[in-house]
């Protein structure tokens, strides 16, 4: 007979942990990328709820492990995405920004550069052909596992900052999704997928059908990405400043005293172009009318 003892636990935000059971022999350690906060990272192409990284045998009293860019590449990617998503949730709690929905499903795809927030697990009904063309070799399992967020990690291996900024960008989209719902998201995501498949650029030129959804969504996501990057690394990298939409508008509104939560609260279901956004901002923050007019005029809006 073979006796197998299994113990599971969660680490705290600093990576510390303690098992409730003791071992007499060296156990085999594994990290499962699922947590109490509300998201999981998967999958290993098998029927499990989240990705698992095998660490190997270690001391019966516990194992200390430092994961960096020289570690296993898959393990590093998973850890960075996990840390970034956890950090985003904490930022939402601190600032009052709407949380992403619970039970988010992440896929980390090393065959792709672009990332996306499809929100399929949360009911966004997207064209299967478009999604399949985007996901590539993972198309056969899309319908079963329905990802919410895909992180394209190609050319980002070993680059903590790049993976971090990409992840918080997509998490910002998930917060926006929680404000607007599935019908809004279908139009928005369809624009993104169609633009990427037809031109190789996710955002198009701003003239296509439903481009207004893209403008609002990407302004918010790039604004949050830049803000959180600056808080972590001490500088604003200006991600997205070259595109036809202008996330700088939101950055300058925040600098002038309009909070992140106030901005997102103006991005409800009916806010699907820049003119409506300005109108809602003026209605909700009439005390900042001069600032709003000045900033929108500065960027030709």
Predicted segments with their positions:
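Metalloprotease/metallohydrolase-associated module, dominated by Zn2+-dependent proteases
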Residues: 201-257
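Extracellular beta-sheet/turn segments enriched in Thr/Pro/Gly and aliphatic residues
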Residues: 45-86, 90, 97-107, 149-153
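Active-site scaffold of zinc-dependent metalloenzymes
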Residues: 118-181, 191
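Short Pro-Gly-centered beta-turn/loop motif in secreted/extracellular proteins
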Residues: 18-29
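Pan-zinc metallopeptidase signature
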Residues: 234-301
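Auxiliary, metal-adjacent structural segments of Zn-dependent hydrolase domains
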Residues: 78-146
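Post-HEXXH active-site segment of zinc metalloproteases
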Residues: 178-208
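Short, acidic Ser/Thr/Gly-rich low-complexity loop/linker segments typical of extracellular
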Residues: 2-16
């Amino acid at each position: 007979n073979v006796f197998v003892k299994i113990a599971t636990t969660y680490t705290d935000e600093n990576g510390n942990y303690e098992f409730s059971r003791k071992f007499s022999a060296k156990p085999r350690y594994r990290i499962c990328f699922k947590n109490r906060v509300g998201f999981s990272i998967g999958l290993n192409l098998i029927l499990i709820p989240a990705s698992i990284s095998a660490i190997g045998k270690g001391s019966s009293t516990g194992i200390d492990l430092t994961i960096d860019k020289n570690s296993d590449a898959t393990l590093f990617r998973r850890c960075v995405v996990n840390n970034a998503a956890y950090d985003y949730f904490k930022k939402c709690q601190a600032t009052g920004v709407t949380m992403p929905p619970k039970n988010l499903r992440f896929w980390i795809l090393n065959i792709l550069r672009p990332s996306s927030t499809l929100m399929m697990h949360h009911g966004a009904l997207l064209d299967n052909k478009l999604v399949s063309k985007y996901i590539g070799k993972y198309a056969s399992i899309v319908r079963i596992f329905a990802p919410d967020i895909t992180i394209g990690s190609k050319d980002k291996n070993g680059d903590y900052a790049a993976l971090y900024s990409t992840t918080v960008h997509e998490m910002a989209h998930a917060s926006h999704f929680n404000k607007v719902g599935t019908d809004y998201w279908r139009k928005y995501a369809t624009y993104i997928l169609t633009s990427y498949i037809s031109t190789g650029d996710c955002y198009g030129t701003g003239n296509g059908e439903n481009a207004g959804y893209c403008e609002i969504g990407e302004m918010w996501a790039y604004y949050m990405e830049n803000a959180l990057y600056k808080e972590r690394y001490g500088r604003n990298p200006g991600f997205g400043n070259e595109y036809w939409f202008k996330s700088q508008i939101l950055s300058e509104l925040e600098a002038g005293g309009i909070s992140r939560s106030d901005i997102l609260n103006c991005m409800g279901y009916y806010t699907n172009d820049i003119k409506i956004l300005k109108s809602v901002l003026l209605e909700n923050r009439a005390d900042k009318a001069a600032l709003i007019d000045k900033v929108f005029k500065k960027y030709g809006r």
